[in-house]
Design a protein with these regions (language model features):
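Acidic, serine/threonine-rich low-complexity disordered tracts
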Residues: 30-162, 202-314
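Bacterial N-terminal signal peptides that target proteins for export
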Residues: 2-12
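C-terminal motif of bacterial Sec signal peptides marking the signal peptidase cleavage site
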Residues: 21-23
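Bacterial signal peptide processing site
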Residues: 25-27
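Surface-exposed beta-loop interaction hotspot
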Residues: 158-204
Length: 314
């Protein structure tokens, strides 16, 4: 009898060990698959120049403030916008900033773009983030957008995996909560990063582009790729990248310096401000550069650092 019990225990431990090993193996395969999802369509890496490394890996961020003239609800609003560019390591699996060094980390140029303006009695606060590989060899790994005003909040996020995975939350009934996938196309949100990384490789001609999440959410349009015409022109020390969407009656122009580090000087967005498209009311939002500051802002959070906002005109 003891012999059989001993045999049963031995068999049980063998089965459990086999399950554990297979489980770990499957988890490893799953993790490997997740790590390679975003990079499965990656092109050869672009080599980083010495000036790029010196400028973007100096241990600080580039912060540029802009005077904003924002069209909203059929009227022009005065406000400010800030573009914060900084390089950081990115976790391929979790698609967040890496806290530790790891061989699978992807170096990205992150853009945090903010806008603040008033619509009558209540304020608008908008922020978009895009994480673009510095080697310019694939789409942005992640894009997110949020807007806050007194009516409520809106949030949307795109993750670059086998497909573009989107989640969206809104207080508007027409948008509500959504979760879906899309085929990969050029993202308008990633082109701002691409200008800073490799402007000579900007897509031009008749192409399919997914408009910015800011535009899509604030205009209540469908998030999808739209036919667009993109051009890149040069005038003196500046270049202008223009995207026109015929179906949306919308044109975006981004003006940036012709020489490295390709700082964005201004932009304009002309669009039909009528949400229901019942009447064409074309208006143009504009942003013009005020000041640029390079600093590790995450270390400048004391009251004695408030003067830095003055240096940015904020």
């Amino acid at each position: 009898m003891k012999k059989y019990i001993k045999f049963d225990y031995l068999t049980l431990w063998t089965v459990l060990f086999s399950i554990l090993v297979n489980s770990c193996s499957e988890e490893k395969k799953s993790n490997t698959a997740l790590l390679t999802e975003a990079s499965s369509t990656a092109n050869p890496k672009k080599e980083l120049s010495d000036e790029f490394k010196k400028y973007w890996y100096a241990g600080d961020a580039e912060i540029t403030s802009y005077r904003l003239e924002q069209a909203r609800y059929g009227e022009m609003r005065e406000g400010t916008s800030v573009l914060i560019f900084v390089t950081e390591p990115f976790l391929a699996k979790k698609q967040v900033k890496a806290d530790e060094h790891h061989a699978d980390n992807i170096p990205v140029l992150k853009l945090n773009s903010t806008k603040k303006y008033l619509t009558g009695i209540y304020p608008y606060s908008i922020m978009s983030s895009s994480f673009y590989p510095v080697h310019d060899n694939q789409h942005a790994l992640k894009v997110s957008f949020s807007a806050q005003e007194w009516c409520g909040q809106v949030y949307a996020q795109l993750n670059n995996r086998n497909k573009f995975e989107i989640i969206s939350h809104s207080y508007f009934a027409s948008d509500a909560d959504q979760e879906f996938e899309m085929d990969k196309e050029i993202l308008e949100d990633e082109l701002w990063n691409k200008i800073r990384v490799n402007p000579n490789n900007l897509p031009v001609g008749t192409i399919q582009i997914i408009p910015s999440m800011e535009y899509i959410r604030l205009s209540h349009k469908e998030l999808k790729a739209y036919k667009a015409t993109a051009t890149l022109t040069k005038e003196n020390e500046f270049k202008t990248y223009q995207i026109s969407y015929p179906e949306l009656d919308r044109t975006l122009k981004i003006k940036f310096s012709n020489a490295f580090p390709y700082i964005i000087d201004s932009w304009s967005e002309t669009f039909n401000s009528d949400f229901d498209n019942k009447a064409k009311t074309m208006m143009s939002s504009k942003a013009t550069k005020m000041k640029t500051l390079k600093t590790p802002y995450w270390q400048k959070n004391g009251n004695n650092h408030l003067s830095l906002r003055d240096s940015l005109g904020l």
